[in-house]
Structures are given as structure tokens and as C-alpha cells.
């Protein structure tokens, strides 16, 4: 009875917070937004700012084929990044300039005024959320054109597309973007660039491994409830070691978390620690196991054999398992039936069955 009462109170509180948030936004919009929507001109576009400052690594990975296509079609491309997802593009040759989105309001305003001097022909915003400060930021940039999705009530976005493909893969949204810019010849394969020195370090690591098959496991995700449990991880590693004792097992992810796993003596922890070293380790691997969509997308970039572990979540109306699915012909996606369930609730024997399938397929 008490649980139901608290659940009801939380629901009321959420609705109240949402109401006041919308009220604050609508009041601010009166002063910040344009009074009318300008006409969208695609023919004169030469310089583009792509907003990818949400700090989500997976979103940045999915954006990389668009960066490549825009550059190859002659556009000058600048990218606004977060500090956490910049690692994906730090060696990307198709981006002419990078900027970082700051945390403090004062610095956000200063950056907006700085970007105004770039005189952008187009700003691309692939995001769903639009806080008041971000509305002001885009207004300050004062680009000729601003492209967005589901921003029909905001006049700054003079090219708005209503998007309600709640079960379509995220790449479908990018295809719509490309069509509206007038680009039809492009490849949506994810495009991650690893510097030569990191490639050489990982090559040396693999050269010292005893086995011919390498399985890469990423135990952790951005949210704790999406982590592989201790019991699952021990079960997976033990099963692989017994089934194929010669298989190399490498763990990738945040070193501070990986170093808290003293029970994994049969594994190699990525000794380099960086995101791009994990990318290169995955590129050379035979099988990847991960609950984290960013690592699943890295594996997809190289069409690696993948066991992708998903809960059953919704982000608004969007079905996460479909929108952020592997998009990889060599991936098997294991999804919980119960909504908002934990990865730890996926039965171990279901995971082991797929490991058996891939190891038999590799057959070395």
C-alpha cells in the first residue's frame, strides 16, 4: 500500500515538474525565438555546424558517416562536441573545426557569440531536447538556416521535420537529413579513425596473445542497471575457458571499473585504457559481447560478430531496442521481454547459447 502511495506521489511530482519546465520554456521562447520562420535555402549552403554536444558516444558514432559524406560533397564542416564523446572524432579527417560545449551559462553565451562570427549557412541539430539555454545558444549563432526534428513550434528552426518512426533504426533519421540537404550518394557505414600509434600498440598486444580466437567483453554500460552482473560475467568467462581454453578474452571499458574485478584472472584488461584503443581491439577481435550501445556500434562499424545485450526501454515514444539496435548483420540482439528490465535478468544460459553459436561458427 505504501509503495503505491509513493509511486502516485512521484508521478504527481513528475507531472508538476514537467508543467513548470514547459511554462518556463514558453515564457523564455517569447523573448528568444524569432517571430516568424524564415524560408529554408539549401542551394547556397557551404559552411555547416553539426551539433553533437550531448556527450553520448553512440550518437557521435552514428553521426560519423554523415560527417564523411558532407565533407566529400564539398561542405566545410564544424562540429560542436561534448567533452565525453569527442574521443570518437579526435582523429577524424573530415571535420574542419571542433568546438566544445561548455557547462556554465556565461561560457555558453560567449561561445554562441563566437560562433556567430563564423557566419554558418546551416546548423544541424539532431537532438530531441531543447532547454532554454540551448534555444538562446542557437539564436546567438544566428545561422542562415537551422535544421531540426520535431521542433515545429520553434521558429529558429526554419527546416523542421516531424519524425515519429518510433521503431525505426536511428540511421533512418540521418537518411532523412541527407535527403533534405540534397545528398543521395553516400555510405551509412560508421567511420571511426584510430591513429597509427594506437594501431601499432594494439597490434603488439595481439601479437603476444597465445590463442587464435579473441573475444572482447565490455561488462559496463552508461547506466548501472544495464551492466552485466558479476554472476553473468563469471559464468561467461568460465564457459568460454572450458569450451575453448585457447581463446583470448580481453575486457574493455573504464579502467577504474575494470580494476575492481579481481576475480577475472583468466582475462586481459585493456592495458591502454582509451576509447580508441578499445576501438582498435574490437576491430581485430572475433567476437564482441556488450550491453553498451556505444561498443555495439563500434563493433557494427567493422561488422564484427556481436552479442548485444539490451533491456526493454522506451525513450519517450521511441523503442530503444529498435532505434539503437546493433544495425549489424553479424550481431545477435538479446532483448528482455519485461519493460525497463535489467541486463542482469537475462538468463545466463541464453547468453551461453549464443556464445556457443559464434564459437562454432568461428571454428578455429
Protein language model features and the residues they cover:
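Donor-binding and catalytic core of enzymes assembling or modifying cell-surface/extracellular glycoconjugates
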Residues: 109, 230-312
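Short internal beta-strands
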Residues: 76-83, 148, 250-253
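Positively charged, low-complexity intrinsically disordered leader regions
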Residues: 2-45
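Active-site donor-nucleotide binding/catalytic segment of nucleotide-sugar enzymes
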Residues: 47-53, 193, 197-258, 312-314
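Conserved nucleotide-diphosphate donor binding/catalytic pocket of glycan-assembly enzymes
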Residues: 2-10, 99-191, 218-219, 223, ...
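Short amphipathic alpha-helix
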Residues: 60-70, 84-85, 236
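Nucleotide-sugar donor-binding patch of glycosyltransferase catalytic domains
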Residues: 3-5, 149, 300-364
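Conserved nucleotide-sugar phosphate-binding/catalytic loop shared by glycosyltransferases and other
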Residues: 2-10, 76-108, 266-267, 329-336
Amino acid at each position: 500500500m505504501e509503495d503505491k502511495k509513493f509511486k502516485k506521489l512521484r508521478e504527481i511530482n513528475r507531472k508538476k515538474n514537467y508543467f513548470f519546465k514547459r511554462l518556463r520554456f514558453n515564457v523564455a521562447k517569447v523573448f528568444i525565438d524569432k517571430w516568424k520562420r524564415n524560408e529554408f535555402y539549401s542551394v547556397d549552403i557551404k559552411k555547416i555546424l553539426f551539433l553533437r554536444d550531448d556527450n553520448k558516444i553512440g550518437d557521435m558514432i552514428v553521426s560519423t558517416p554523415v560527417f564523411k559524406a558532407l565533407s566529400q560533397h564539398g561542405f566545410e564542416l564544424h562540429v560542436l562536441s561534448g567533452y565525453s564523446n569527442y574521443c570518437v572524432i579526435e582523429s577524424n579527417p573530415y571535420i574542419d573545426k571542433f568546438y566544445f560545449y561548455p557547462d556554465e551559462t556565461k561560457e555558453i553565451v560567449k561561445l554562441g557569440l563566437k560562433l556567430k562570427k563564423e557566419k554558418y549557412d546551416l546548423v544541424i541539430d539532431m537532438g530531441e531536447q531543447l532547454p532554454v539555454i540551448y534555444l538562446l545558444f542557437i539564436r546567438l549563432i544566428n545561422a542562415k538556416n537551422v535544421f531540426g526534428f520535431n521542433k515545429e513550434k520553434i521558429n529558429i528552426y526554419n527546416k523542421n521535420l516531424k519524425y515519429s518512426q518510433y521503431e525505426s533504426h536511428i540511421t533512418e533519421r540521418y537518411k532523412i537529413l541527407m535527403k533534405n540537404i540534397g545528398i543521395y550518394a553516400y555510405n551509412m557505414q560508421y567511420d571511426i579513425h584510430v591513429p597509427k600509434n594506437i594501431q601499432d600498440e594494439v597490434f603488439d598486444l595481439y601479437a603476444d596473445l597465445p590463442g587464435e580466437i579473441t573475444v572482447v567483453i565490455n561488462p559496463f554500460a552508461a547506466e548501472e542497471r544495464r551492466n552485466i552482473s558479476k554472476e553473468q560475467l563469471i559464468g561467461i568467462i568460465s564457459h568460454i575457458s572450458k569450451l575453448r581454453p585457447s581463446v583470448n578474452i580481453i575486457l574493455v571499458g573504464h579502467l577504474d571499473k575494470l580494476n575492481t574485478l579481481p576475480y577475472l584472472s583468466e582475462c586481459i584488461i585493456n592495458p591502454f585504457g582509451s576509447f580508441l584503443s578499445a576501438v582498435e581491439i574490437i576491430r581485430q577481435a572475433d567476437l564482441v559481447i556488450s550491453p553498451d550501445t556505444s561498443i555495439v556500434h563500434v563493433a557494427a562499424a567493422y561488422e564484427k560478430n556481436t552479442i548485444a545485450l539490451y533491456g526493454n526501454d522506451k525513450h519517450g515514444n521511441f523503442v530503444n531496442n529498435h532505434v539503437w539496435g546493433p544495425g549489424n548483420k553479424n550481431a545477435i540482439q538479446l532483448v528482455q521481454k519485461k519493460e525497463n528490465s535489467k541486463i542482469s535478468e537475462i538468463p545466463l544460459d541464453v547468453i551461453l547459447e549464443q556464445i556457443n553459436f559464434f564459437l562454432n561458427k568461428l571454428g578455429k
